Amino acid sequence: MIQYKVLIPEISLLILAIISFFYGFISRNYRTTYILSFLSILTAIILSVFNFGQKEFTSELIKIDLYRQTLRILVLFIGVFIIGLSYSDLKLKSSKSVEYVFLLLLSLFGMNLMIVANDLLILYLALETFSLSLYILAGFYRKESLSIEAGMKYFILGTLSSIILLGSIVFFYAQTGSTSYETFKLLKTENLNILLGVVFLISAFAFKLSLAPFHAWAPDVYQGAPTAVTAFLSTAPKVAVFGALINIFLSINLKLNIQDLIVIISALSMLVGNVLALRQNNLKRMLAYSSIAHAGYMFMAFLLPEKELLISLIPYLIVYVFMNLSAFAFIMNIKNGESIQNYLGVGRKNPLLSFCIIVIMFSLTGVPPTAGFIVKFNLFKNLLSYGYGSLVFFALLMSIFSAFYYLRPVFYLYKDSLVIDIYNHPLNNSMALSGALLLIFLGLFPNLLLIF
């Protein structure tokens, strides 16, 4: 039986989302809509913080512990950041802002429910809740062909991944007679149903994580979606899906023979993401391929035992979120900021904004003393201690290779005189600067990250 008090943050978020939707629908005041949505997420964060560190709760449907609490708070912080980015986008300050904000809040509810799910059916319902919202958000600019294409492509391929996930649930149910993760702990021997269930599950989740070879949707969707939505797509679903994948992997006590599959998907994602990013002149497409590569790095953590998995993956997820959100805040400060060529001379015009993108790109590459270096070093060290030297060497080569495309925007900052306008969005400026400073701070004080 569920004790609903452990789900108060999610329940409050859903109720407040509905209230803000009807209020916004009546008033049609975009400013009020964004304020109400911000307060809704803030309320959920406060309630989650009050529950943080409390006794672990487990039922057949829901499980709450320290790392799940951390991830649900992280998702909510992403929501706050996205509300700020969306508020500065003139195209989202319209009569449709009510629907936009409601879909955003609904997707946050689904993601947090997915993180705490302890049952495959709850997981599936949660995934569909946030996926359906994201399909609409990706195509929210209905007058722009790229946005419509992004929404349709994401919807069609996302539906396929949902079908694969249902297949995974069937295999697990056929073996255990239940969809609860708790029954997975009772399994004594590995068999074909369990192995196929895990493989189908990884395949379905690999789509949401944009892992190769399930990555084809990412560049077009990232480019066509509104920039604030792209920032959301590149971060929040990864936190939710990686959280769910951790939950399932830790629930299955069997030693599954899928290490080779994890190695292949990780290596292929790093290779595809880094090599194809080198050809991109559109920064949103470049960050799409970057997210494929980083998903590959993070997926390697599933080769590790429980403790090392958590202390490797959770800090990486936190840093990855701040790197990406800060990068998109920077993009939204430059007129036509998707094109790298438009950064010519920005370094001379706005040194503070240039400092932000330099720190962000260094952190994405993994250059010390940024937090990006700390989490990569921590992951590689743990993998080395368990005998994955060849994979770590390949990942290190890919990290070095990534410098060639991450540093291209930095090169353009000081190449010529300014040829494009810089928007003066105080909110975006402060978010980009806060993210950059946080990446340096966590790089200098890594113990704050490695608390798991």
Curated annotation (Swiss-Prot):
Keywords: Cell inner membrane, Cell membrane, Membrane, NAD, Quinone, Translocase, Transmembrane, Transmembrane helix, Transport, Ubiquinone. One of its GO terms (cellular component) is plasma membrane. The keyword Cell inner membrane applies. It is a multi-pass membrane protein. Its EC number is 7.1.1.-. It is found in: Cell inner membrane. One of its GO terms (biological process) is ATP synthesis coupled electron transport. InterPro entries: NADH-Q_OxRdtase_suN/2, ND/Mrp_TM. Pfam families: Proton_antipo_M. It comes from the Bacteria. GO terms for molecular function: NADH dehydrogenase (ubiquinone) activity; NADH:ubiquinone reductase (non-electrogenic) activity; quinone binding. It catalyses: a quinone + NADH + 5 H(+)(in) = a quinol + NAD(+) + 4 H(+)(out). The chain crosses the membrane at residues 6-26, 33-53, 70-90, 97-117, 120-140, 154-174, 194-214, 232-252, 258-278, 286-306, 311-331, 355-375, 387-407, 432-452. PANTHER family: NADH DEHYDROGENASE. NDH-1 is composed of 14 different subunits. Subunits NuoA, H, J, K, L, M, N constitute the membrane sector of the complex. NDH-1 shuttles electrons from NADH, via FMN and iron-sulfur (Fe-S) centers, to quinones in the respiratory chain. The immediate electron acceptor for the enzyme in this species is believed to be ubiquinone. Couples the redox reaction to proton translocation (for every two electrons transferred, four hydrogen ions are translocated across the cytoplasmic membrane), and thus conserves the redox energy in a proton gradient. Belongs to the complex I subunit 2 family. NCBIfam families: NDH_I_N. HAMAP family: NDH1_NuoN_1. This is NADH-quinone oxidoreductase subunit N 2. It comes from Thermodesulfovibrio yellowstonii (strain ATCC 51303 / DSM 11347 / YP87).
